[in-house]
């Protein structure tokens, strides 16, 4: 980190707190930081505004919402780097930028857009860039900006249990390491509380179910997830819900707000 002037941390706009690696703040120390709320097209725009305001209050931090649907903002990142470090970015002094982020937050897509060509493989499963991007550690961008990539790594212990669920729901944890029924139940309960109208519209319901179990059963019935004897296949129904959340089929969803996280953190600290 001694040769880094600025850090870009890429997070998932649907779960900014849960996808923010706490080790980044320790590593960057006094260096300015651009926090990217990526995949903002999949996140609730009103809640994204709350998060941008929240992060902009931090010392030395500028937050920016980005989406693959609008590459112009991504391509403007070098200009933002120069604004944060006006004394660098000249022919004499380049701005040395390190880009960091947990798996599957869209870091590879961001790098490819900035570079104007494919340097890192893009995929829906975490850690697909590990082997492909080796040897592509340093990228020279427009305006004498040197961008260094780092592997996407989850920190060893996640203290907030709800964050673990949110990371699984949005795809930051490999499918082979999760219980679909467990995380789908978590997601279903949240959607009933926060986005009941979208649930009703997507699954053509007369009214929103009272519980997550009931919602998963409704999805199973309406999507033909039935076993012998008409028993609902809860595994298949769970996979459908998680897939439709990740793909944006349910609309723009956010799974945490600054106020929600403040309350959860206070509860954890009290214990």
Go through each PLM region and give its residues.
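Glycine-rich phosphate-binding P-loop
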Residues: 97-122, 150
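Short, well-ordered alpha-helical segments in soluble proteins
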Residues: 81-88, 114-122, 126, 154, ...
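Solvent-exposed alpha-helices and their adjacent loops that cap or buttress functional pockets
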Residues: 92, 113-114, 139
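Canonical P-loop GTPase G-domain recognition
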Residues: 34, 40-102, 119, 224-226, ...
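Short, conserved active-site entrance elements at the starts or edges of catalytic domains
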Residues: 27, 39, 111, 115
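Alpha-helical scaffold segments in soluble metabolic enzymes
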Residues: 76, 80, 109, 113, ...
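Helix-rich effector regions associated with P-loop NTPase G domains
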Residues: 1-6, 13-33, 40, 46, ...
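Short phosphate-engaging motifs
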Residues: 73, 106, 146
């Amino acid at each position: 980190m001694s040769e880094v002037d600025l850090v870009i941390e890429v997070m998932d706009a649907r779960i900014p707190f849960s996808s923010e690696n706490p080790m980044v703040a320790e590593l960057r120390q006094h260096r300015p930081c651009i926090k990217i709320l990526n995949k903002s097209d999949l996140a609730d725009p009103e809640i994204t505004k709350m998060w941008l305001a929240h992060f902009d209050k931090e010392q030395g931090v500028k937050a920016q919402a980005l989406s693959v649907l609008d590459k112009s903002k991504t391509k403007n990142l070098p200009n933002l780097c120069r604004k944060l470090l006006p004394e660098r970015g000249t022919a004499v002094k380049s701005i040395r930028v390190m880009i960091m982020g947990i798996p599957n937050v869209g870091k590879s897509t961001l790098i490819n857009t900035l570079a104007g060509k494919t340097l890192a493989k893009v995929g829906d499963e975490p850690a697909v860039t590990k082997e492909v991007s080796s040897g592509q550690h340093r990228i020279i961008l427009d305006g004498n900006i040197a961008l260094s990539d780092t592997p996407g790594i989850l920190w060893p212990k996640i203290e907030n249990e709800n964050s673990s669920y949110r990371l699984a729901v949005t795809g930051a944890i490999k499918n082979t390491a999760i219980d679909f029924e467990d995380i789908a139940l978590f997601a279903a309960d949240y959607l009933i509380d926060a986005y009941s109208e979208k649930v009703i519209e997507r699954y053509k319901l007369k009214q929103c179910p009272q519980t997550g179990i009931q919602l998963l059963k409704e999805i199973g019935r309406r999507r033909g997830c039935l076993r012998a004897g008409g028993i609902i296949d809860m595994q298949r129904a769970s996979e459908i819900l998680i897939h439709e959340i990740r793909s944006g089929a349910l609309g723009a969803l956010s799974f945490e707000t600054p106020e929600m996280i403040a309350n959860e953190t206070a509860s954890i600290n009290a214990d």
